């Protein structure tokens, strides 16, 4: 039996099985809004509509795609989530370009859900430790005098906020933001801001006095980080950063345990 004959034989023998499998697995039909979304996305990516240019009106899109208003609106909402259009009340959708913030925004819901699972906070804290460890080493090796001055200014605001918990949290976030800005990578910034937002939102409510003590410890650890960066010592900067974040993690874990016992 030749090769082609053998192939033909296998095809004939297996066709009833394939037919049964296909009948048991119906093809998924796309919604009209999904088809409109895909077509508009391709048009935007082909530069048929330039950045900042308005798309046709809803009525024109309805006529062009021969669909109803709900399908057009769903498609535009999906494109907005992707960062491909901006939608303002009373105006036609305008083409935009997705940013790092758009990417992080898409992940935000999943991240918050993950944080609510057992061990979720610990996993995100480990991610933050790995991420900021790289940032602080880079800062110690490459930070300019101007960037170190910005860190010092953030540290000064830190010190002025020790007795005001809300202000200290803002200055704490700002200190780490200045650190994340040093490489000049907008994706790093978006990841860093999102990580802190997610972690802070997951933290328990704590009495003011306990937070005052925590603020003072964090401030002293920030000083150690800046001193190491100023000396351009990446190993010492990394040790100071890891000591700081491990301390923060342990403190908030203890706060959480105390809060749970009171419930």
UniProtKB/Swiss-Prot annotation:
Domain of life the protein comes from: Bacteria
Q: Which GO terms fall under molecular function for this chain's record?
A: DNA binding; DNA-binding transcription factor activity
**What positions does the domain HTH gntR-type occupy?**
30-98
Q: Could you tell me which residues form the DNA-binding region?
A: 58-77
Query: Per its UniProt record, what Pfam families does this chain match?
Result: FCD, GntR
* Keyword terms, alphabetized: DNA-binding, Repressor, Transcription, Transcription regulation
Q: Give the GO biological process terms.
A: negative regulation of DNA-templated transcription
Q: What residue spans carry the region label Disordered?
A: 1-21
Q: Which InterPro entries match?
A: GntR_C, TF_FadR/GntR_C, Tscrpt_reg_HTH_GntR, Tscrpt_reg_NanR, WH-like_DNA-bd_sf, WH_DNA-bd_sf
Q: What task does this protein carry out?
A: Transcriptional repressor that controls expression of the genes required for the catabolism of sialic acids.
UniProt similarity note? Belongs to the NanR family.
Q: Which NCBIfam families match?
A: PRK03837.1
Q: What is this protein called?
A: HTH-type transcriptional repressor NanR
Origin species: Escherichia coli O7:K1 (strain IAI39 / ExPEC)
Gene symbol here is nanR
